[in-house]
């Protein structure tokens, strides 16, 4: 995760420094600092990439001209951090255009490293946002080899590059957030200019529905509820749960 400045200090002050290094990023070999900070909550370890130049100002999403360099840096730094920590995942799960360069980095810049053995899954939440910008700018900031900037991968309309399109090309599996959305984005009406590309890569597509496991979060058996209920019409027990939640939140 990026260590954004907007993360509440109560979490940041408990982060533990795990190491740092410098990484080549741009096509001219310019180097950037990569710090690794670790945070633990309920037995889960979260690793944060620390770099004040990219993450110390603004919100997670600002404007495209600033977000392109930021997410080129983050995508490459996250993989470099895994190598630094000597931790090789079986699968790297990327979300939307912001992390769509990860599959390309895995198969190019990191192909001969330990993390290069990982498979890449790319999830599309909203196809409308694709990370499209001037090809020369994305080529410079990503430092990716020239051969990935072609019409079947990153290039769009010759002058632009499309980061999400490149991720679709290089990922091992592509997932969407519903069964219907997977089909819709392959149509000209909802494909946002990528319908043909998505149809070409449809063999990668797996459909994972957003939502909850109703066998776990079941009102009649959920032990976390103050009062269980079996029907939508059992208002009294719902009121008890509402009151318990309000009391727990002060």
Where are the regions a protein language model picked out?
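Catalytic cores of nucleotide-sugar-dependent glycosyltransferases that transfer UDP/GDP/TDP-activated
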Residues: 1-250
């Amino acid at each position: 995760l990026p260590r954004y400045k907007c993360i509440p200090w109560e979490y940041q002050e408990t982060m533990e420094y795990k190491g740092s290094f410098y990484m080549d990023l741009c096509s001219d070999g310019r180097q950037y600092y990569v710090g690794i900070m670790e945070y633990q909550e309920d037995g889960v370890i979260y690793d944060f990439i620390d770099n004040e130049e990219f993450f110390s100002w603004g919100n997670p999403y600002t404007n495209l001209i600033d977000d392109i360099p930021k997410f080129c840096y983050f995508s490459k730094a996250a993989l470099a951090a895994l190598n630094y920590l000597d931790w090789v995942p079986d699968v790297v799960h990327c979300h939307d255009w912001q992390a769509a360069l990860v599959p390309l980095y895995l198969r190019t810049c990191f192909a001969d490293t330990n993390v290069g053995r990982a498979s890449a899954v790319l999830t599309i939440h909203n196809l409308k946002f694709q990370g499209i910008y001037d090809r020369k700018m994305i080529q410079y900031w990503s430092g990716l080899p020239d051969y990935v900037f072609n019409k079947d991968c990153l290039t769009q309309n010759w002058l632009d590059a499309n980061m999400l399109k490149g991720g679709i090309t290089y990922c091992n599996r592509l997932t969407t957030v519903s069964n219907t959305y997977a089909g819709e984005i392959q149509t000209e009406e909802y494909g946002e200019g990528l319908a043909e590309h998505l149809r070409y890569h449809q063999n990668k597509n797996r459909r994972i529905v957003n939502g909850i496991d109703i066998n776990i979060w079941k009102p009649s058996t959920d032990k976390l509820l103050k009062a269980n209920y079996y029907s939508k019409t059992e208002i009294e027990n719902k009121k008890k749960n509402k009151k318990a939640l309000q009391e727990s939140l002060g």
